[in-house]
């Protein structure tokens, strides 16, 4: 499988300022993510950042990095600048690896690239089963509903599908399967170029979910169930502390 992994690494973060450079047992977070992506078998791994400090950290670690404009509204827009700068061909598979996933299993990165290659869709992603009621009703856990062939019908922060009879009896136990979306994407370069030309959709503004723009404009997203459990992401100081402990066990 031939693909390029790009890691958008925006320096500003409302809940964890300077997140890409946060130290995780002797290495910046962005370097931890880069090393995971390099282990996936990607032909090339590029960090895309708006901050010179991140550029220097990646270069010190021997990685490839590109300094983007600071005014991008999303990670996908940052990707688009990179693919245009390097003039990647339209059919090149690009995997968007989130810059705050220092424990992401390399297998997931390869799997989402494989998923796109075998699907009739402009975009591919992954999901995992939801096993607890707490997660099912957590708006920070994005749910996805798919059709019989695995193509996304809708993504939502709400609990979908809603089990009318089951939840009427109890909301403590799940009587049907739900899927939680994992924020990793694969697309071909031409799809990214088209995506950034579309205006933001009403649904994505309501849910604050960028992927809803794809469905709004009639495109398909294929969703596969992840082959392994995803690693823990980092959005808060508390999560950073947890990831440091987990990484210590791996080092």
Curated annotation (Swiss-Prot):
Enzyme Commission number, as recorded: 2.7.7.38
Keyword entries, A-Z: Cytoplasm, Lipopolysaccharide biosynthesis, Nucleotidyltransferase, Transferase
Class in the EC hierarchy, top level: transferase
Cellular location(s): Cytoplasm
Alphabetized InterPro entries for the sequence: Cytidylyl_trans, KdsB, Nucleotide-diphossugar_trans
Major subcellular location class: cytoplasm
GO cellular component terms, semicolon-separated: cytosol
Pfam family, one: CTP_transf_3
GO molecular function terms listed in the Swiss-Prot or TrEMBL record: 3-deoxy-manno-octulosonate cytidylyltransferase activity
UniProt pathway: Nucleotide-sugar biosynthesis; CMP-3-deoxy-D-manno-octulosonate biosynthesis; CMP-3-deoxy-D-manno-octulosonate from 3-deoxy-D-manno-octulosonate and CTP: step 1/1; Bacterial outer membrane biogenesis; lipopolysaccharide biosynthesis
Coiled coil, from the record: none
Record CDD domains: CMP-KDO-Synthetase (cd02517)
HAMAP family noted in UniProt: KdsB
Family affiliation: Belongs to the KdsB family.
Name of the protein this chain belongs to: 3-deoxy-manno-octulosonate cytidylyltransferase
This protein's encoding gene: kdsB
């Amino acid at each position: 499988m031939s693909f390029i992994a790009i890691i958008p690494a925006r320096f500003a973060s409302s809940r964890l300022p300077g997140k890409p450079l946060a130290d995780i047992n002797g290495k910046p977070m962005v370097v931890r993510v880069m090393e995971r992506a390099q282990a996936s078998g990607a032909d090339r791994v590029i960090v895309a950042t708006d901050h010179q400090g991140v550029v220097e950290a990646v270069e010190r670690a021997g990685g490839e990095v590109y300094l983007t404009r600071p005014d991008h509204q999303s990670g996908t827009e940052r990707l688009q600048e990179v693919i245009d700068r390097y003039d990647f061909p339209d059919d090149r598979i690009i995997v968007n690896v989130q810059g705050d996933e220092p424990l992401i299993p390399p297998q997931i990165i390869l799997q989402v690239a494989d998923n796109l290659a075998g699907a009739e869709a402009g975009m591919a992603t992954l999901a995992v089963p939801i096993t607890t009621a707490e997660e099912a009703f957590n708006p920070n856990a994005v749910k996805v509903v798919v059709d019989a062939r695995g193509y996304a019908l809708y993504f939502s922060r709400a609990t979908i599908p809603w089990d009318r009879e089951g939840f009427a009896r109890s909301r403590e136990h799940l009587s049907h399967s739900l899927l939680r979306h994992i924020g990793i994407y694969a697309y071909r370069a031409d799809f990214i170029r088209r995506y950034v030309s579309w205006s933001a959709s009403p649904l994505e503004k309501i849910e604050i979910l960028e992927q809803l723009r794809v469905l709004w404009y009639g495109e398909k997203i294929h969703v596969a169930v992840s082959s392994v459990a995803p690693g823990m992401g980092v959005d808060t100081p508390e999560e950073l502390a947890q990831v440091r402990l987990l990484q210590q066990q791996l080092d």
